[in-house]
Amino acid sequence: MTISYLPKEEHLLEGTDEQMKRLTSAGIPRTDVEVKIFDDHDSELPPGKMGEIVVKGEVVMKGYWRNPLATSETLRGGWLHTGDLGVMDEKGYVYILDRAKDMIISGGENIYSREIEDIILLHPAVHEVAVIGVPDETWGEAIKAIVALKEGQKATKEDIINFCKEHLASFKKPKSVEFIDAIPKNPYGKVLKRELREKYWAGEARRVR
């Protein structure tokens, strides 16, 4: 950030392309905090490679109150795993690009996909479901349910949304529903949510809002 006090008629403030690009970054770490980018095996990645943003320092929490499981999942090897995906450039600037944790931020509310998925799976016509966040001009992200129905079963978008309204807070119900034949998974059975999100976020520099 640059603060100046000059008559606009006689001064023009310009930045290089490199400097202007860094306006989209989260900045550089504080001197008392270490920030690195880790891969899926908790190994450090070189500049420019996308991975999970991890943090270490005296200002980092020691753990979650009375929740050792969450603590062990988030604090590993002395590093706090933020759940955000990003890159760090050669100068140490960090860019947040996507979210590793299965969370949607809509209208300022943190919404966990798993909670919504567990409810939708209770619907008698639903075989599988994946809940993702898609871009929304008003809410930042909107909740979208991608549903595979059981063979021979039928359900409409309204059926799924109304079912969620009966069991969830209003802000957690999906704003849209898409029906597909099968939910894509990797060989280990993990749902490929990034693949599902891609067509909605294509063209966006960042996968978070």
State what each model feature region is.
Residues M1-V33, P47-G51, M61-K62, R76-G77, ...:
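Conserved ATP-binding loop and adjacent catalytic segment of the adenylate-forming AMP-binding
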Residues I3-K8, F38-D39, K56:
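Short beta-strand-to-turn element immediately C-terminal to the catalytic PLP-Schiff-base lysine
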Residues M20, V35-K36, L85, A182:
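Generic short beta-strand
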Residues V35, V129-V131, V177:
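Generic structural signal for residues in well-ordered beta-strands
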Residues H41-E44, G57, K62-R66, E73, ...:
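AMP-binding/adenylate-forming catalytic core of the ANL superfamily
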Residues E198-R209:
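Acidic/polar alpha-helix N-cap and adjacent early helical turns
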